[in-house]
Amino acid sequence: MEQNDIFALASKAMEEKQAVKESEKTCIIVGEKGSGKSTLVSALTNEEVKGERKPTAGIDFKYSAKKVEAKKVVGNFHEIGGGRFLSDLLQTVLNSSKLKDAVVIIAIDMSQPDTALYHLDFWLKKIRNVVDKAIQQLEKDNPEAASKVLSQSGYKWEGHTDGRRVFPIPIQTIIVGTKYDVFGIEESENKKWMCRALRFFAHTNG
């Protein structure tokens, strides 16, 4: 191989390396005991489940990396076990340094429709409270970063007809209904009202 070929290959490799940008995200999964959080994490990380699952105690961490187009996306998944009894653990992983790239997923057990909305309301309020405290700390440490987080959450509602009725949680929050196969056997009228209620909670929280 000629010397020029070596330099050409080295140059091409360097260009390709620079072209592949890395993006890192933090995903926090919360919900009641037995709501399907671990199953959800396994699906998100393409983890093969072997044997019977054991209840998650405390915080369980998993890591996943995927290439999306020319970008390497790194996902840090934190599952908070123990339900609301250990809900205060949320503030240990959702702190001021993680707000910019954090996503929270609330797993709602749809096989328990009588309590699903009650649990959803609890977790939405818990997340809002933790995020508000983290933003207060961020405003002290980095006012510019805090302003950016807040602006991202509210800009899309400017001029919207429901703008005064919506109070968005400052970070991306996703509601996932689990065990829908069980919920699916409910009467159609019950499913209709439950879905309307879930949309209402999702809409009013941004």
Give the residues covered by each predicted segment.
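Structural beta-sheet core signal
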Residues: 29, 106, 175-177
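Eukaryotic intrinsically disordered and solvent-exposed regulatory patches
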Residues: 12-16, 26, 49-50, 59-64, ...
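ATP-binding Walker
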Residues: 35
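Inter-motif core of Ras-like GTPase G domains
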Residues: 87-150
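A conserved segment at the C-terminal end of the G1
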Residues: 38-53
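Switch I (G2) and immediately adjacent beta-strands of P-loop GTPase domains
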Residues: 52-100, 108-110
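Canonical P-loop GTPase G-domain recognition
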Residues: 171-174, 182-206
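Short, flexible boundary segments at extreme N-termini or domain junctions of P-loop NTPases and their
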Residues: 1-32, 63-66, 74, 86-87
